[in-house]
Amino acid sequence: MELGLTGLRVMVSAGAAGIGLAIARAFVREGARVSVCDVDAAALAALAQSDASLHAAACDVSQRDEVVHWFEGALAHLGGLDCLINNAGIAGPTGKVDAIDPEAWDRCIAVDLTGPFNCVRLAVPALRASTNASIVNVSSLAGRLGFALRTPYAAAKWGVIGLMRSLAVELGPDNIRVNALLPGIVAGERQHRVLTAKAQARGVSFEDVEKSAFAGTSIKQYVTAEQLADYVVFLASRRAATISGQALSVCGDTNMLS
């Protein structure tokens, strides 16, 4: 399928590894011009070595001054903006709500919810000048379902859905599409860390927690970063011209998180 993304100007937060890197590379393959940010200096350096076409900057999206610096450099490099991918996020603490450190709560909300806001408020003026403008927020299935022992993360990801739906209504008259992607159980190091922490919190084995995680899922296999990237590039294309305000689950039909 020809998506017509040649020359599209894209910014991807947390784009130096994992899902963000898969998204950035998918856009590059489609001929887009891409800027990424990340907090991982080593991953950024490795990315710069492997792909000179990508513009990269160190940035913690919870820090407004760092976001401003990223946007100034990216917009100058790209010459404008057509698509913002709010991908940055952290897993937050795992544990019973009465045992969660309030500072860990604050940090999770700051990165996972305030971070997308910090990026959106700077992106919108540039997106208004685009003829194919879109925003994709990477939320989570935890933004649709309750998630025991992951209260901060779930609260933030529900907030990302609310942000997306409100922006879709507000920015629709400017022809800016806004959608959210809700990944289920994603393969990778981060998911392994989350399941390990949950096993420790419950006093059970990793294998037991992994089995429990898939108990409410019809298709019992991990979602891959590459599958998610395919959805994102489609949503950024003109083939998705009338898709906005949608929370799209990529989860193997998961109906319960545990």
Locations of regions flagged by a protein language model:
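Short C-terminal tail/terminal secondary-structure segment
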Residues: M1-E2, A91-T94, L145, Q221, ...
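Substrate-binding pocket helix/loop in short-chain dehydrogenase/reductase
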Residues: G95-V97, D101-I109, A213
